[in-house]
Structures are given as structure tokens and as C-alpha cells.
Regions:
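Short, conserved active-site loop motifs that form the nucleotide-linked donor/cofactor pocket
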Residues: 99-100, 173, 192, 275
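Structural alpha-helical scaffold elements that stabilize or flank donor/cofactor-binding regions
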Residues: 110-112, 168, 289
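Short, hinge-like loop/turn segments at secondary-structure boundaries
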Residues: 89-92, 166-170, 273-279
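Short glycine-rich anion-binding loops that position phosphate/pyrophosphate groups of nucleotides
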Residues: 52-54, 79, 107, 122-129, ...
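Nucleotide and nucleotide-moiety/phosphate-recognizing core
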Residues: 34-122, 132-151
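Short, hydrophobic beta-strand segments that form beta-sheet elements in well-ordered domains
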Residues: 102-104, 151, 175-178, 257-260, ...
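YjeF_N-associated NAD(P)HX repair module
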Residues: 116-230, 235-236
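Small-residue (G/A/S/T)-rich helix-start motifs and N-terminal tracts that mark the onset
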Residues: 1-68, 72, 182-294
């Protein structure tokens, strides 16, 4: 199970390992289309309601794999506002293929026209907080209809990490998420499909452009159970001990002290509020000061 932040790390690591975001979007879209085919009958109408990010891009791809259905794609916004280059490429592919792709330029102009299936691809795992417009109005329209609703990655309006909604949220009948389950999906009253989209296992354990492998912690642990580290340095410069201390926090130690000259103590503290800064007398570190520093 991966949190939204951890999933972003895995995506970045996969790209560094040679699996491009474009490849992942193609695989994700194909996975969405497979779930739609499971819930729809041949000839059914399918409306894909899409955001302007990668989540919407997944649905643009899915639309190309749904030629057996009466498909309409509703982009919540203008084409020019689509944030990702690969998503814009897939929007252009829809237009080139003469698939019914519409720009929804204000929340009142969304017309779903009573489809049999709705694909909710407005917002993905990285979104938090209450839905804004036009997504809020679109979510209400989806919920008020009688269609089977398939959400991409997570129902829009639901926090992927907590399962909570800060306001209106899409009421999904099915959810298709990618690579691994997300913590917030366990609370949903809907079947969840976890689709393998070709992310290598090394993306979870290799340090690349994303981040270090996530750390597993006992939720009943106390501060200090995961290491106490003392960083000694500074004077007249603060960068080295401050960066070393911050890096130590990121690797998982939860009590990190930085012993540095008083002249740079405030600067070091400003790098991260999680650092415990011990201000030592003088402008440089010497043997006498080290003896007074402690973890």
C-alpha cells in the first residue's frame, strides 16, 4: 500500500529507470478501459469527465480503447490549460481520431446526456481538500445521474490517504487504481481494481529522482525510537551542518541535534524546525565545545 506522496516517488523513480510517464499513461488508460468494458454492454454510452492533469490524460487514453461504445470526452477546462505535455498529446490524438471530445469552459455547460457509464477522471491521488469549480458541480452531476461510475485512481473529492471527503465527492461504483492500493481506498463502499501498469519493482527500492524507499514505522512507537543523531559543525558557515541535519531527518532519524557556534545557530535552525540546535560559545568548533555537545 502506498500513500499519494510515496506513489509520486515511485513514478519519478520509474521514469529514472527508463519507464517514461508516457508509457505509464498508456498502460493506465488501457487499464481504465478494461474496467469500463467489465461494467458496460456493447453499444452503451460512456462519458469520460476529465481533469487537466495526468488523471485526465489517463482517461484520454482510455477513450481510444473504447471504440465499441458511444464515447464522449468532457475536458473540464480549455485544452490550453491541460498541465502535462503527454496529456495534451493524448487530447490531440482524440481530436485526430474524430472521437467526440468537448471542452467544458464553465461548470454550468457540462451536459452528460444520461450516459450508461461515467468515468470520473477529474482528480487523482495528489489532490486534497474540498473540490473547487468546475469539479464540484461535475461531481454533483455525476452523483445525480443513474450511470455506473468508474473512478480513476481515487473518486474525485476523496483523500487517497485518509478516505475522507472535505465536501462533495464522486460516489463511485468501481475504482481502478495503479500499481498498488492507496490507504484511503479501504474505506470505500466500492470494489477496487489495482492495475499493474508496468512499474518495475526497483522503483520502490532504488534511490533515483524520486526519493528514498519509504520507511516502515510502528504506529505505537515513540519519538527517539528511530535513532538519535548529533551533527557537529559550522563556523563561520552554516550550510554543511544544516544540510546534514536536514538530510538525517529525511533518512528517518527522529531526534537530530546540530551543535554549532552560537553565531550561526539561528541560521541552522531556519533550515528545518525539526532540528534541535545546540548553540556553542565561540565562532568556531573546537575540542572544548565538542565535549559539551550531547545527543
Amino acid at each position: 500500500m502506498l500513500t499519494s506522496e510515496e506513489m509520486a516517488v515511485v513514478d519519478a523513480n520509474a521514469a529514472a529507470l527508463g519507464v517514461s510517464r508516457k508509457q505509464l499513461m498508456e498502460s493506465s488508460g488501457n487499464a481504465v478501459a478494461r474496467v469500463v468494458r467489465e461494467v458496460a454492454d456493447a453499444g452503451d454510452s460512456v462519458a469520460l469527465v476529465c481533469g487537466r492533469g495526468n488523471n485526465g490524460g489517463d482517461a484520454f487514453v482510455a477513450a481510444r480503447f473504447l471504440s465499441a461504445f458511444d464515447v464522449t470526452v468532457h475536458l473540464l477546462g480549455r485544452e490550453a490549460t491541460v498541465s502535462a505535455d503527454i496529456a495534451r498529446e493524448n487530447w490531440a490524438a482524440l481530436e485526430a481520431a474524430d472521437i467526440d471530445a468537448r471542452e467544458v469552459r464553465d461548470s454550468e455547460s457540462l451536459a452528460l446526456e444520461d450516459p450508461d457509464v461515467v468515468v470520473d477522471a477529474m482528480l487523482g491521488t495528489g489532490a486534497t481538500g474540498a473540490l473547487r469549480e468546475p469539479e464540484a458541480t461535475a461531481a454533483r452531476a455525476i452523483n445525480d445521474g443513474g450511470a455506473t461510475v468508474v473512478s480513476v485512481d481515487v473518486p474525485s473529492g476523496v483523500d487517497a490517504d485518509t478516505g475522507e471527503a472535505a465536501g462533495v465527492a464522486v460516489e463511485a461504483d468501481r475504482v481502478v487504481t495503479f500499481h498498488d492500493a492507496k490507504p484511503g481506498l479501504a474505506a470505500l463502499d466500492a470494489p477496487v481494481t489495482v492495475a499493474d501498469i508496468g512499474i518495475p519493482a526497483a522503483a520502490e527500492r532504488v534511490v533515483e529522482r524520486g526519493d528514498l524507499l519509504r520507511l516502515s514505522r510502528d504506529p505505537t512507537a515513540h519519538k527517539g525510537d528511530f535513532g538519535e543523531v548529533l551533527v557537529v559543525g559550522g563556523g563561520p558557515y552554516a550550510g554543511a551542518p544544516a544540510l546534514a541535519g536536514r538530510a538525517t531527518l529525511r533518512t528517518g532519524a527522529d531526534l537530530v541535534s546540530v551543535a554549532c557556534p552560537a553565531a550561526v545557530a539561528d541560521t541552522v535552525q531556519g533550515y528545518d524546525e525539526g532540528l534541535i540546535v545546540e548553540a556553542l560559545s565561540g565562532e568556531r568548533i573546537g575540542p572544548d565545545q565538542i565535549g559539551r555537545a550531547h545527543v
